[in-house]
Amino acid sequence: MAKTAQFYILTENCTLTVEEIACNLAASIWRSGKKVLISCESEAQALEIDERLWQRDPNEFVPHNLSGEATQYPTPIEISWLGKRNLQRRDLLINLQQEIPDFSHSFTQIIDFVPKDDALKTQARERYKQLRLQGWNLSTENVG
């Protein structure tokens, strides 16, 4: 199966944060029947994603958990951060880290972001180059 990576480019007109877009994408992907790992740069970012998912309208509830949380049943969306990740199988990786996670090879689909900030944009370009060199099929989409 071909490995694909989709980069979402936040344009100057975009009013959403990367975290908001990641939550919306995770919800949509889960509704299509896939299990998602959102890999955050920090625990603080993971907690922000967790809170955003809990704040959604009750009719749009998205079952999720933070890595390491005890749950009776596995949830379809896991939120992890550097150094903290369960080993449960997931279909798609939403990468919010500054680098490509070392476990990315276990996925066939990655979603990543190109923020507006120049330093973060440079890091995103490096991730794009890395994935291209590893043979991933890459695509981009403007947001905003």
From Swiss-Prot:
Gene Ontology molecular function terms on file: DNA binding; DNA-directed DNA polymerase activity
Top-level taxon: Bacteria
InterPro entries: DNA_pol3_chi (IPR007459), PolIII_chi_sf (IPR036768)
Biological process annotations from GO: DNA replication; positive regulation of DNA-templated DNA replication initiation
Gene3D superfamilies per record: DNA polymerase III subunit chi (3.40.50.10110)
Enzyme class (EC, first level): transferase
Coiled-coil regions, chain positions: none
EC number: 2.7.7.7
Catalysed reaction, written as an equation: DNA(n) + a 2'-deoxyribonucleoside 5'-triphosphate = DNA(n+1) + diphosphate
Pfam families (alphabetical): DNA_pol3_chi
Function text: Part of the beta sliding clamp loading complex, which hydrolyzes ATP to load the beta clamp onto primed DNA to form the DNA replication pre-initiation complex. DNA polymerase III is a complex, multichain enzyme responsible for most of the replicative synthesis in bacteria. This DNA polymerase also exhibits 3' to 5' exonuclease activity. This subunit may stabilize YoaA and/or stimulate the helicase activity of YoaA.
Assembly with partners or alone: DNA polymerase III contains a core (composed of alpha, epsilon and theta chains) that associates with a tau subunit. This core dimerizes to form the POLIII' complex. PolIII' associates with the gamma complex (composed of gamma, delta, delta', psi and chi chains) and with the beta chain to form the complete DNA polymerase III complex. Interacts directly with the psi subunit (holD). The only subunit of the DNA polymerase III holoenzyme known to interact with single-stranded DNA binding protein (SSB), interacts directly with DNA helicase YoaA.
Family per record: Belongs to the DNA polymerase III chi/HolC chain family.
Protein known as: DNA polymerase III subunit chi
Organism: Haemophilus influenzae (strain ATCC 51907 / DSM 11121 / KW20 / Rd)
Gene (UniProt): holC
